[in-house]
């Protein structure tokens, strides 16, 4: 036997011994204690409704819980898909239920439907993250924490009678690892029974061929194994919703009145509404809550903790302590921080160098422009000086001509003034 096998044998816990009691102790009341505590604490159940606008999501919710939930009228012109949660306090007998209905408003209404699933996935992850953060608190209070994790997704399929839309396949494929999906055919009274049967077979075949994992009612519990196995064969449920009461015979029943007859909501020959209500609420509600916590949330939690550096040890290695994980993550963070600082410093140096080169280039351009303007100025100054010199020469020449002209004029004037005097002298002589 190998050394590791010996270690495993030596470290194995001894089998507990079975003992008989000599009298009544009292721990047989544990189930009653658990029931009493659960009833006092109350229950929460969160339903996500995904389907096109006007397909009957709100009507079905009102029909399922036999009440009228206040909801806003949805529009066909939503720019993007948005999640609208509404929480209600319900009570049946002495059981208190905090019910949250989350409607995917605007789903399938956009021209570009490539990312229609993204807001839904983000919302589900956000609820997981909120619960994880509450778990990681030093002083956590999960007892009175309002659990908003989605327990079931009712996926409403348009009753085309042909096949699933690509949007439906893509969305359910993105959601199947995050939430329990129950596909239902809405407004099932719009297609015939034969077409409905073929449509169900077509839908299940497409889901299997595309690897979409929908919620299967559990068959490991003997108390519900038989009914759940039968109901699994009826998926997807074809439902009709209505809050109106119609008189059929001598009693009022919830139904839809048509010119050709009445479709009774709770008549299993007309639709699968009763099957859906039984499977969703009466038989498997607790299993949906448990699957959400033990499967979908645990998968999210494990991925998040692995991202943080936590991991489970295998059988041959020592378990990782929180201190070791902290130190490893701290070193990793510090090295990453130093790397980022070096990158930023180098980026800053490169930016400074680029700025210096740009400034030098600007300086050179300004200097060249200055020299060019200086040469232009000197040339203009030379031209002005030359013009001034020419003007002075012309002015001097003009003054000289003017002086000569004035001298000639004075001589001529003097000569004309002497002529009469000479004539007078000649007469006297």
Swiss-Prot record:
Bias type Basic and acidic residues, positions: 1-16
Septin-type G domain boundaries: 41-307
Positions of modified residues (Phosphoserine): 10
Any Gene Ontology biological process: regulation of SNARE complex assembly
Highest taxon in the source lineage: Eukaryota
Biased composition (Polar residues): 409-420
A cellular-component GO term for this protein: axon
Ranges where the record places region G4 motif: 186-189
G1 motif, as annotated region: 51-58
Matching CDD domains: CDC_Septin
Family assignment from sequence similarity: Belongs to the TRAFAC class TrmE-Era-EngA-EngB-Septin-like GTPase superfamily. Septin GTPase family.
Protein name per the record: Septin-8
Chain's gene name: Septin8
